[in-house]
């Protein structure tokens, strides 16, 4: 199947780069493998991508674009799967970039344990929180203060920018005393205080200019796997996730070559011969072929 034959094209010369940025998130996919709904659950497809820096998008004023991106995706279930996922990312970095030049790899995400664990497997890496999710937690907590919401929001950001963890903690505890719904404040405490060092990096390191992982999940995975009412087998979703990344990494023509190669390999296994004719493959056949395998 496609999941077993996707090759990595090792560059002839390693690139020199001081900093790399990795952003990660996940897509939640509906499962369909049985006749009855109770047999079908949900699962996630993990996504991460590496880039070297951001630059102005020449086509859209005021918008940044990522330079030299490379995508990774798939189900990678359980702790062993997470380890395999990040080891794949580390292998790509080792094969592509000069380790003598590389100083730091910044990992950004929403605080999920599997993303945080990247620092265990990716050399020279530091975890940084996604400001988008941090803003959501702050807004939700501040809104519990009703008429004093704006003041609460300003104070929370003040303690972050002044690196005052103890004051941040004390202030959120005071918020709890008068909040009608304490849950958003508890969630903010857990997220911010539990990832305080990562929060400080995100808000004080000038190299970090925001994380767009949620948008990438939408365009790379959700657009095909979860945005419309549909169900997937886990094998099918894993293969489609990898296909979507392969097309992003190498282009559509290379994707067609990959499917042709996959078909040839399966045919050789069935016939026990290397004498296989090369066939033309359309994009419609590609998607049908991978769906049928699932």
Predicted segments with their positions:
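Catalytic center-proximal scaffold of phosphoryl-transfer enzymes
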Residues: 1-294
């Amino acid at each position: 199947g496609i999941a077993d034959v996707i090759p990595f094209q090792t560059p002839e010369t390693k690139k020199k780069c001081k900093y790399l940025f990795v952003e990660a998130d996940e897509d939640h996919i509906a499962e369909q493998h049985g006749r009855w709904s109770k047999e079908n659950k949900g699962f996630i497809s993990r996504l991460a991508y590496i880039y070297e820096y951001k630059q102005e998008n020449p086509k859209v004023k005021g918008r940044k674009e990522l330079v030299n991106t490379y995508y990774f995706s798939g189900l990678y279930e359980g702790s062993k799967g997470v380890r395999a996922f990040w080891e794949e990312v580390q292998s790509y970095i080792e094969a592509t970039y000069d380790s003598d030049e590389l100083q730091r790899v910044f990992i950004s995400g929403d605080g999920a344990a599997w993303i945080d664990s990247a620092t265990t497997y990716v050399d020279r890496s530091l975890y940084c929180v996604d400001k988008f999710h941090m803003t959501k937690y702050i807004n939700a907590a501040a809104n519990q203060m009703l008429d004093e919401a704006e003041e609460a929001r300003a104070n929370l950001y003040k303690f972050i920018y002044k690196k005052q963890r103890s004051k941040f903690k004390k202030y959120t505890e005071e918020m709890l005393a008068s909040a009608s719904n304490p849950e958003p404040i508890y969630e903010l405490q857990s997220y911010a205080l539990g990832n305080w060092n990562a929060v400080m990096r995100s808000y004080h390191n000038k190299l970090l200019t925001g994380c767009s992982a949620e948008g990438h999940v939408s365009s790379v995975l959700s657009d095909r796997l979860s945005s419309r009412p549909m169900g997937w087998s886990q094998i099918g979703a894993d293969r489609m996730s990898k296909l979507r990344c392969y097309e992003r990494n190498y282009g559509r023509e290379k994707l067609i070559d990959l499917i042709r190669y996959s078909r040839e390999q399966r045919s050789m296994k069935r016939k026990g011969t290397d004498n296989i004719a090369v066939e033309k493959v359309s994009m419609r056949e590609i998607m049908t072929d991978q769906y049928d395998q699932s």
